[in-house]
Amino acid sequence: MSGKTIFDKLWDQHVIAGNEGEPQLLYIDLHVIHEVTSPQAFQGLREAGRRVRRKDLTYGTLDHNVPTQDIFNIQDLISKKQIDTFTKNVKEFDVPAETHGGKGQGIVHMVAPESGRTQPGKTIVCGDSHTATNGAFGAIAFGIGTSEVEHVLATQTIWQVKPKRMKIEFQGHPQKGIYSKDFILALIAKYGVDAGVGYAVEYSGDAISDLSMEERMTICNMSIEFGAKIGLMNPDEKTYDYVKGREHAPKNFDEAVSKWEKLVSDSDAQYDKILSLDVSQLKPMVTWGTNPGMGLEFGEKFPEINNDLNYERAYQYMDLKPGQTASAIDLGYIFIGSCTNARLGDLEEAAKIIGDRHIADGLTGIVVPGSRPVKEAAEAQGLDKIFKEAGFEWREPGCSACLGMNPDQIPEYVHCASTSNRNFEGRQGHNARTHLCSPAMAAAAAIAGKFVDVRTLVTD
């Protein structure tokens, strides 16, 4: 009998009922909620006279609608209603949650790991597609719909069909100036935005082992843009070190680690598909079009029109042409933030590139830490001063300009170098034009006034 993947091990440990190949009932170890997808779920509980079954396994925060300047002055009526409703619901149902402007408030996919709630071996769900971020810890984590949010609140379980297993091997060691954001953008560009559909993706290889936990989260975060619902990695010493000492880390930590060490893929585990990517010669990545698969290494020419891939529409929307390169993009905005790249390490890398330089004339740059703990840690290092002296706006935590659900929207027809995860039409605002890249690449673009090869600015 062949060995098991980490995904198989975790799935089997959490199945309550059902046969393989059919929907199976899974027990959920952590349910994270935010203000956008939880209101209808709580209302459903209220109307049915139900309670939250496991309040101790539920955790909430505010992120999508929160302003990042005057955080309590919410002008948009829908945003205000969602925030007020969330605050009312978590109080009424006695659910642990970060308060608006509170010490732990931040993007949902950041505060769960930062608080120590995200741990190896867990099943984690949230009404948000980028929940896969938590898979970097060796957890099965995935996004769910609003009706499923209600089901988990009421039962602490969810029905799911087990996906197939894919292994992706990141081979080699990257050059300086190449980051995990480049890994995942290159993977999506190579294999496409649908390559992961129907799979739980396990990321492996020497290049993954070398990454910090923050960098690993970036890759798992964008599993969704690869088409997969679930992305995860085998836990190791870096995982345990990250969790250790955090508020909600296991009390008997050594005992927990002894269990976690068994939650790795066996050497003879079988996969339904195996893909690979050599990162040793990888160059910085930038997207040119309107989905994350429309990305190229810096210096490559934009491709000829391929109607099967909607290139013509993408070129029209982005106001670009085949044969151009990323350096020809007329940037007007720089956004460093989002659940993909707003962690302390991301801000540190961007600040290193900036140094004592100033952003180019005509550019607007905003830096939005993903959580209050990250903001405070960055300020303790003086990173906020580096950004502000360079001409960036230093904001309060939130989802910010990743999506057009709060005041931080990119102006119409403006090109934005963004460290977020999606470059769809209108994602950052009406007719906004998004170019995905790493934080260091965004910082380099801010200084130069256009996309440049960040490797020329890396000093250590």
Swiss-Prot record:
Keywords: 4Fe-4S, Amino-acid biosynthesis, Branched-chain amino acid biosynthesis, Iron, Iron-sulfur, Leucine biosynthesis, Lyase, Metal-binding. Belongs to the aconitase/IPM isomerase family. LeuC type 1 subfamily. This is 3-isopropylmalate dehydratase large subunit. Heterodimer of LeuC and LeuD. Binds 1 [4Fe-4S] cluster per subunit. One of its GO terms (molecular function) is metal ion binding. Its cofactor is [4Fe-4S] cluster. PROSITE patterns: ACONITASE_1 (PS00450), ACONITASE_2 (PS01244). The gene is leuC. It catalyses: (2R,3S)-3-isopropylmalate = (2S)-2-isopropylmalate. Pathway: Amino-acid biosynthesis; L-leucine biosynthesis; L-leucine from 3-methyl-2-oxobutanoate: step 2/4. NCBIfam families: leuC (TIGR00170), PRK05478.1 (NF004016), PRK12466.1 (NF009116). It comes from Lactococcus lactis subsp. lactis (strain IL1403). [4Fe-4S] cluster binds at residues 339, 399, 402. PANTHER family: 3-ISOPROPYLMALATE DEHYDRATASE, HOMOACONITASE, MITOCHONDRIAL-RELATED. Catalyzes the isomerization between 2-isopropylmalate and 3-isopropylmalate, via the formation of 2-isopropylmaleate. GO terms for biological process: L-leucine biosynthetic process. Its EC number is 4.2.1.33.
